[in-house]
Structures are given as structure tokens and as C-alpha cells.
From Swiss-Prot:
Assembly notes: Interacts with the Sec translocase complex via SecD. Specifically interacts with transmembrane segments of nascent integral membrane proteins during membrane integration.
Membrane-spanning segments: 3-23, 359-379, 429-449, 467-487, 507-527
Recorded topology in the membrane: Multi-pass membrane protein
Gene Ontology terms: cellular component: plasma membrane
Keywords: Cell inner membrane, Cell membrane, Chaperone, Membrane, Protein transport, Transmembrane, Transmembrane helix, Transport
Organism: Ralstonia nicotianae (strain ATCC BAA-1114 / GMI1000) (Ralstonia solanacearum)
Cell compartment(s), UniProt: Cell inner membrane
Protein name per the record: Membrane protein insertase YidC
Residue segments, region Disordered: 44-64
Recorded family membership: Belongs to the OXA1/ALB3/YidC family. Type 1 subfamily.
Pfam families assigned: 60KD_IMP, YidC_periplas
Organismal lineage: Bacteria, Pseudomonadati, Pseudomonadota, Betaproteobacteria, Burkholderiales
Length: 553
């Protein structure tokens, strides 16, 4: 039965590793064990970082009197564009008058590994990630048209908001885009005003899309999560779309509806176009060029008579995946925070972690406190497991004697083993079931710590300055290895020397793997191991005291 317990531990360990590897591949990353050769691809981009001819086509043919959507983004005799920088207390946005799009968005409250503001939207040689919009259904202003910016303040200053309006006139349609930036908000309110200044009716369609390259944001396979488009509607709810599915033309796109939004998701951060409620919208997702993708929506604005105007509004979110903030923006947006398939357990754990943080004010100590609470909840199960293991350890000499006495008769050996278990009232698998029950909680807590942007840049104490990054001095992984080694010494020693060596090797293997895990996760494991050691030692001591008392009588 010791062999069965050892085998179960090995299966559990391998299951955790293989489950993680499968989850990595499901989120578009390479397998740790079966990596596929990466093909380096380049994007054939037009000047400015985006492919030519990427203006979306209208969902339906243009009405009579309207021109077809442009096949390319080429514009003759275009005036020179300029870049306008708008700054608030939380973001710094660079708006290019070419297309009236945000070509760079810096999150001032989030820092990258070099201590600079985290860049979300970007158009550079290294990457392209843009939120674009415009009109189709005719030769109308789109994201390749050069707009004219209005005069006005560019910094928030002491005010509550700052706005920027950009206008362009083309093909009989005048489009005015107005961006409103608000204090403390990662949401940019956007208004589209369309005026027909031609002599014939027009039928413009507004499009809003998020376009980016398919490159991974963070290369470490140990804490990278899903990168790619996502779509939400009240009917289909939330679903992610992998770049691989887009390449294979297998991407699922919801049917036209009057609810929902599109998003582009990456580790810790996301962006989303959120149209006004009840506005009819059609979704699309495709690959524009090699390694360049987009997800978007089209909203028909109806027939606009000469001299008439029509307006539409939307919100553009670009910021961190802070769950409570996302819940307050629009229904379902909090789902961009990826908890994996154990969301039903992970969400309550994060809620509890938040409550603890409000009391302690430090995410590291909050993880410690949460670990203690989880350990208290599982205390009865753990105690049962440790009692069973302690009894098995006491029976070890007698079990070894039975094996030696009946080494040539396995059936007789098993019969005597079962008799011994019944006599001593020991369940040989009693130490395993409580461990199995706790596995989903551990995995859920793993995803909580992995996906929570609150851990990013959050210090604990001393050398740990970022709970979302690996321990820079590997102190926590070493402590974890030591704690696992102590645990193996408290457990019954497997009778087979090979199994015993395997159990001694496991702490080393796990500690090496955890060198690359976020410090917050390793902190949880270390604290959990220390609590387990204390509990197991106290139970072993209590059973030893009871045994001495019984012998004295």
C-alpha cells in the first residue's frame, strides 16, 4: 500500500505538470515538452505600420447613390499628419491625425520591467496594436484618412476631463470623431458625428475594430496567458478566439445582435470597443496580413439625406484587468480576466483575497493570510490524512517483516497486510483522498495569483519587489524545496529504494520548476508547506504521546 501511495503522489505531480502544459497549448503557447519549431514571419506593412488595403468591407452592398467601399487605403495628395499627445492622471495617449486613431497608449500607473509606463496600444517596428474606426459603404473617411484636429487643451490639468475632436470630409460625408478622456478612467468616451455635405443620400456604416500582430506579449511559458481576440454577446456570452483558429478560418463569430462588445486580450491587460446599448452591430474577425489580425463590429447608420446628420457613441476601454473596475464598465467585461476552467472556485478565492488586502494593505501578507484560512478550512481533512500517514509510519517495521516473511507468496503477503490494517484500524489510502480533494483549490488559487494584475509590481518584503515575477534570488523556491524535503521525512519511507530516491528527488525537481514561477505563487506554496509540516508534526507528536500513555497503563 505504500507503493500505491507513492504512485498516487507521482501521478498527482505529473498531472499538475501535464495539466499546466495542456493549458499552455490551449492558450496558444508552446508545449514545455513537445515544442514546435517557430517560424519567424514578417508583416508586409504599409508606411505607418499597418497593411495597405485593410479597410473592412461593408456587411451589405451599398445602397443606390453610394459608392462601394474602397479596395485599398491609398489616398492621393494626402496632407501631412501630426501626432497629438493627451495626458490624464492614468494614461498618456498619442493620437495620429492619420486615421484619427490612438497609435500609442501608455498606462501611467503600470510599469514595465524597466520601470517605464506600460505601453498597450503601439505602432512601432517591434509590434502593432491599434484601436481603429471609420466609415465604409462609400469613399468615406476611414482609418487611413488624414483628419484635422481641433484646438484646445491636451492635458487634464486640474479638470475632470479633456476632449479632442478630429474631422475629415471625403466622398460627401463629413466625419467628426470626439475622444473624451476622464480623470481616473481607462475608458475613452467616443462620439462619431456624420454629416452628409453632398448632393445625394448616403448610407454610411460605422466600423470599430482592434488590430494587432500575433506576437506573444510575454515569452515566459510559466506565466503567459491567452493572447488574442474575444467576443461577448448576451446570447453567446464570452468566448475567446485564437489566432490559430483565425488562420484556419475556424473562428466563431456571433450573429448580428443589439448587445455585446469585442476585445483584444493579453496577460494582465485588455482593450475593448463597447458600442451604445441597443445599437445593432455585426461582428467580424479575420487576418489582415501575415501575422496581423483584427476583431471588430459594424454598425449601419441608415440613410442620411443631403444636409442631414447622424451620430453614434461608443466607449473604448484600454487598461489593466482589475476585476471590480471591469464589472462596472459593461456586463461580462470582467471575463477577460482568465481564471481557466476553475472559475467557480477562483472567483470566490480572489474575492476573499481582496477583502484581506483591504485589511492588511499588502498583497504578499494577504497571500499568507489567505493560505492560513484555506488551511483552516481543510484542517479536518488534512488531520485525517496526517493521522493515517503517522499510523502507517508506526506500522512500517511490521509491514517490512511481513514482506520479508512472504516475499515469495504475494497473495499471502497481501492477506496478512489487510489483516494488519483491519486490526490496527488503518486505511492505507486514507492519506491520499484528502490530498486529492484539495487539488482543485490549489489549481484555482494558482490561476488567481497568475491572472491578477494587482500582483504586478506589488512588493512583499525585503528582496521580493514584484509578486508577479520570479524571485530574483531564488530564496522562496529554495525554501519550498527545503519544506518539501522535511515533509518527505515526516511521511512513511517507501520500502522500495527506488521509490525512496524518487520521493527524495521530487523536492529538487519541483524547486527547479518553481524558479520560473511568480513569487506570489511560490510564497503560497511555501506557507502551505510550513503549515502542513507544523500540523503533521503536532499530530505525530500527539499520537506518540498517546502511544506512550497507553503503554504505561
Amino acid at each position: 500500500m505504500d507503493i500505491k501511495r507513492t504512485i498516487l503522489w507521482v501521478i498527482f505531480s505529473l498531472s499538475v505538470v501535464l495539466l499546466f502544459d495542456n493549458w499552455q497549448r490551449a492558450n496558444g503557447h508552446q508545449s514545455m515538452f513537445f515544442p514546435t519549431p517557430q517560424t519567424v514571419t514578417t508583416t508586409a506593412a504599409a508606411p505607418g505600420g499597418t497593411p495597405a488595403g485593410d479597410v473592412p468591407k461593408a456587411a451589405a452592398p451599398a445602397a443606390a447613390g453610394s459608392q462601394a467601399a474602397p479596395a485599398t487605403g491609398a489616398v492621393s495628395q494626402t496632407p501631412a499628419s501630426e501626432k497629438i499627445v493627451v495626458t490624464t492622471d492614468v494614461i498618456r495617449a498619442t493620437v495620429d491625425t492619420a486615421g484619427a486613431i490612438v497609435t500609442k497608449l501608455e498606462l501611467l500607473t503600470q510599469k514595465d520591467h524597466d520601470g517605464n509606463p506600460m505601453v498597450l496600444f503601439d505602432r512601432s517596428l517591434e509590434r502593432t496594436y491599434l484601436a481603429r474606426s471609420g466609415l465604409i459603404g462609400g469613399d468615406f473617411p476611414n482609418h487611413t484618412t488624414v483628419f484635422t484636429a481641433s484646438a484646445g487643451p491636451r492635458d487634464l490639468g486640474t479638470g475632470g476631463e479633456v476632449s479632442l475632436t478630429l474631422t475629415a470630409d471625403k466622398g460627401g460625408a463629413k466625419l467628426a470623431k470626439t475622444y473624451v478622456f476622464k480623470r481616473g478612467s481607462y475608458v475613452i468616451d467616443t462620439r462619431f458625428d456624420v454629416t452628409n455635405d453632398g448632393a445625394a443620400p448616403i448610407n454610411p456604416t460605422l466600423y470599430m475594430e482592434l488590430a494587432r500582430d500575433g506576437g506573444a506579449v510575454e515569452q515566459s511559458r510559466f506565466y503567459s496567458t491567452f493572447t488574442g481576440p474575444a467576443v461577448y454577446t448576451d446570447t453567446d456570452h464570452y468566448h475567446k478566439i485564437t489566432f490559430a483558429d483565425i488562420d484556419k478560418s475556424k473562428a466563431h463569430v456571433p450573429a448580428p445582435t443589439d448587445s455585446g462588445w469585442v476585445a483584444m486580450v493579453q496577460h494582465y491587460f485588455a482593450s475593448a470597443w463597447i458600442p451604445a446599448a441597443s445599437a445593432k452591430r455585426e461582428f467580424y474577425v479575420d487576418r489582415i496580413d501575415t501575422n496581423f489580425y483584427r476583431v471588430g463590429m459594424q454598425q449601419a447608420l441608415g440613410t442620411v439625406a443631403p444636409g442631414a446628420s447622424v451620430s453614434a457613441t461608443a466607449r473604448l476601454f484600454a487598461g489593466p484587468q482589475e476585476e471590480r473596475m471591469l464589472e462596472g464598465i459593461t456586463p461580462g467585461l470582467e471575463l477577460v480576466k482568465d481564471y481557466g476552467w476553475l472559475t467557480i472556485i477562483a472567483k470566490p478565492l480572489f474575492w476573499l483575497l481582496e477583502k484581506i488586502h483591504k485589511l492588511l494593505g499588502n498583497w504578499g501578507w494577504s497571500i499568507v493570510a489567505l493560505t492560513v484560512l484555506v488551511k483552516l478550512v481543510f484542517f479536518p481533512l488534512s488531520a485525517t490524512s496526517y493521522r493515517s500517514m503517522a499510523k502507517m509510519k508506526d506500522l512500517q517495521p511490521r509491514m517490512t517483516a511481513i514482506r520479508e516473511r512472504h516475499k515469495g507468496d504475494p497473495q499471502k503477503m497481501n492477506q496478512e497486510m489487510m489483516t494488519l490494517y483491519r486490526t490496527e484500524k488503518v486505511n492505507p489510502l486514507g492519506g491520499c483522498l484528502p490530498i486529492v480533494i484539495q487539488i482543485p483549490v490549489f489549481i484555482a488559487l494558482y490561476w488567481v495569483l497568475l491572472s491578477s494584475v494587482e500582483m504586478r509590481g506589488a512588493p512583499w518584503l525585503g528582496w521580493v519587489h514584484d509578486l508577479a515575477s520570479p524571485d530574483p534570488f531564488y530564496i522562496l523556491p529554495i525554501l519550498m524545496a527545503v519544506s518539501m524535503f522535511v515533509q518527505t521525512r515526516l511521511n512513511p519511507t517507501p520500502p522500495d529504494p527506488v521509490q525512496a530516491k524518487m520521493m527524495m528527488f521530487m523536492p529538487i525537481a519541483f524547486s527547479v520548476m518553481f524558479f520560473f514561477f511568480p513569487a506570489g505563487l511560490v510564497l503560497y506554496w511555501v506557507v502551505n508547506n510550513c503549515l502542513s509540516i507544523a500540523q503533521q508534526w503536532s499530530i505525530n507528536r500527539m499520537l506518540g504521546t498517546n502511544k506512550k500513555a497507553a503503554a504505561a497503563k
